[in-house]
């Protein structure tokens, strides 16, 4: 069994806050409280050092702007997953507006930007968007279905700080049931390419009632075999295209917590649960260029305003976690 290929150091983003210096991890989406000896901005740190730092939920920081955001610059996708968070009726802005939003985020105090979709690897200008964000000091990740990752991994390796690949099952039968024939093999090929090019890589899996109990352990074992950094299990959010599945497929946060507490594996791969409660208040910039924010219970998402200036990112309630 292959264990995670962990580089001596990787890139995080740090800045001072009223609660002390904080460090955002672009791979896991977690935020940590750090000592004052760290520099602000993009910093190289070891996983061991960061793992030893206490986690702090963004809501506890009472910041003026989100610690991290998800930016979905496009709706287009080569797959049609029934549990997708995105709303396919949202219009897409043109390329110049995507550049404008990238520059706005780069000028803000947001520490982490996760570029999602749709399928972000369909964007030809993705490397340029990443470069703009990195130049502004953000830690940048890309969340992808992985089917185009093998051909784009080399170009991403010199730019992006982390990739998160969505898998819905530990094998082709279970994954392809949700994402279509052949999608598992292409996603795994993408994971292998990302790992081979030295990109910090993790698997993300949405917990679904019909599959969770049989899939959690083999998913962690697959992650170990592929040499990724970790697995994050995400509580299903009843928003976007996936809202119609909520009644049948949602687990409660207590059920999800108990499920992972009972996980029995010898793998050293780190495992994390992102609960629905933790996602309450999380900020998303959708393809229409509007700032959207999860409701406090993360059972719905609201459009707040167009993102025209940094002030439009302002928090009016608790921040949420990726």
What are these regions (language model features)?
Residues 34-42, 67-72, 95-98, 116-122, ...:
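Short low-complexity stretches enriched in small and charged residues
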């Amino acid at each position: 069994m292959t264990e995670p290929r962990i580089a001596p150091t990787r890139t995080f983003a740090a800045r001072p806050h009223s609660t002390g210096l904080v460090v955002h991890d672009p791979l896991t989406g977690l935020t940590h409280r750090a000592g004052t000896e760290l520099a602000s901005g993009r910093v190289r740190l070891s996983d061991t050092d960061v793992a030893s730092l206490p986690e702090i939920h963004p809501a506890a920081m009472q910041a003026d702007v989100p610690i991290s955001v998800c930016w979905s610059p496009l709706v287009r996708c080569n797959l049609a997953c029934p549990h997708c968070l995105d709303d396919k009726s949202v219009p897409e802005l043109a390329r110049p507006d995507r550049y404008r939003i990238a520059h706005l985020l780069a000028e803000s105090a947001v520490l982490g930007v996760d570029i999602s979709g749709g399928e972000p690897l369909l964007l030809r200008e993705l490397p340029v968007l990443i470069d703009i964000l990195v130049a502004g000091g953000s830690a940048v990740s890309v969340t992808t279905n992985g089917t185009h990752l093998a051909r784009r991994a080399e170009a991403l390796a010199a730019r992006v700080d982390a990739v998160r690949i969505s898998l819905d099952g530990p094998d082709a039968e279970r994954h392809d049931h949700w994402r279509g024939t052949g999608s598992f093999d292409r996603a795994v090929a993408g994971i292998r390419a990302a790992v081979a090019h030295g990109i910090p890589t993790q698997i993300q899996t949405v917990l679904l009632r019909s599959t969770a109990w049989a899939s959690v352990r083999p998913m962690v074992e697959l992650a170990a075999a592929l040499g990724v950094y970790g697995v994050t299990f995400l509580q299903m959010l009843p928003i976007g295209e996936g809202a119609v599945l909520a009644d049948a497929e949602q687990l409660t946060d207590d059920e999800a917590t108990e499920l992972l507490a009972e996980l029995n594996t010898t793998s050293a791969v780190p495992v994390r649960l992102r609960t629905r409660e933790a996602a309450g208040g999380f900020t998303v910039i959708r393809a229409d260029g509007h700032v959207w924010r999860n409701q406090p219970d993360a059972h719905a998402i609201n459009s707040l305003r167009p993102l025209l200036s940094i002030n439009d990112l302002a928090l009016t309630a608790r921040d949420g976690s990726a």
